[in-house]
Amino acid sequence: MKKKILLMMSLISVFFAWQLTQAKQVLAEGKVKVVTTFYPVYEFTKGVIGNDGDVSMLMKAGTEPHDFEPSTKDIKKIQDADAFVYMDDNMETWVSDVKKSLTSKKVTIVKGTGNMLLVAGAGHDHHHEDADKKHEHNKHSEEGHNHAFDPHVWLSPYRSITVVENIRDSLSKAYPEKAENFKANAATYIEKLKELDKDYTAALSDAKQKSFVTQHAAFGYMALDYGLNQISINGVTPDAEPSAKRIATLSKYVKKYGIKYIYFEENASSKVAKTLAKEAGVKAAVLSPLEGLTEKEMKAGQDYFTVMRKNLETLRLTTDVAGKEILPEKDTTKTVYNGYFKDKEVKDRQLSDWSGSWQSVYPYLQDGTLDQVWDYKAKKSKGKMTAAEYKDYYTTGYKTDVEQIKINGKKKTMTFVRNGEKKTFTYTYAGKEILTYPKGNRGVRFMFEAKEPNAGEFKYVQFSDHAIAPEKAEHFHLYWGGDSQEKLHKELEHWPTYYGSDLSGREIAQEINAH
């Protein structure tokens, strides 16, 4: 009887092993059904999938990816797919709701940007990358962490390589039987992107004019990666004639800087183009944001590479012609965030502004979580500092062994946690001090003093979060010592920095990168 049971179990094991092999064979020979959101995602995914899948696209040309609302039919299409690929939650803002509505766990969801850090979106840039040497950070006041970031990474060939790699890795992990094909396809596609990247670098690295003016601020990554400055203007669209007032101010701006071209996301109407030419003396040209191609355009042979090369050709109408440095119409850098304010605007604050549980960012610097931040800063500095130099600079600034701080505004206590050991002291407000930096901007230190005589090194503390009046802090830099408040005022090189304990390292890196 025992032999029969063992034989039966062996047969069952062989049967299931055979079934698993057959299932893998069917998957290996069959095609993966992939739904993508809009054109760049579709293009990059096809480059990875090749002949091993059927790739479709939800949005037609002319559809705004931000505002798209998927129909019931669209949801079902995603539900029935093997994989769903999108660019980023900041681009396809509707995707988070779609993910929640999916009932099938078989759908592999792929985010093109992966763990890529993004820069601040238009209108959210705090303009202080040049202030790093005096540590003039800005406070972030957005409640959400999605809408404030720029998702247009595909307009930089350099960053598009990372997007393709992310899609490749995610699909290879989901379908290991097809991984070799996906990797081979991606390698071929990435080589084409590298060639495009070389073309952009060769054409723009020695540009005679580094600034270009655009009506659609989608080209920040392209500008960043190839050493240019994107200047965004408002009040001008390709299909609506500017007001007489706007034409008058634009005309002065154009003449002041010798601007020859304004770039639009699509062909400007003849009326708009004529008005700009006649009244402002500037021509209209197209830089495509590549959010969609029509079926007719694709059948005619247009694709990501042809459009990007056309963009480069059009951009060179500006970059190949020497001219004075073009500055934005309005100087948006002299804000309270960046240290420009009047003395009368500075108000006293209470410890409750910093209530909560806070974690040091220093461990994330040590483990490499912040490495992308240094790469971004190096590019923003345009050669003034390298990524390694930024990391060294911030290593000095962030360094601390106080890994956590808990602040109770009601009890007016601060608890310092070092290697698991806690020390709690009670604090009274000791006033504020306005510090003036060599470049002309300023900062405010809000001072507190411990009541306990045994507070030691934590006797005096000073907060700096780049706010100048009562408001809830999102992060802060803390200075502490046992000698005097005056001695702490002189500390400009070492500023331990703290973010909410509920944030992940990547979330903190993203916040730092956008400031």
From Swiss-Prot:
Pfam families tied to this protein: ZinT, ZnuA
Signal peptide interval: 1-28
UniProt-listed CDD domains: AdcA
Gene Ontology molecular function terms on file: zinc ion binding
Binding site for Zn(2+): H66, H152, H216, E291
SUPFAM superfamilies on file: Helical backbone' metal receptor, Lipocalins
Family under the similarity heading: Belongs to the bacterial solute-binding protein 9 family.
Official protein name in the record: Zinc-binding protein AdcA
Native source organism of the sequence: Streptococcus pyogenes serotype M6 (strain ATCC BAA-946 / MGAS10394)
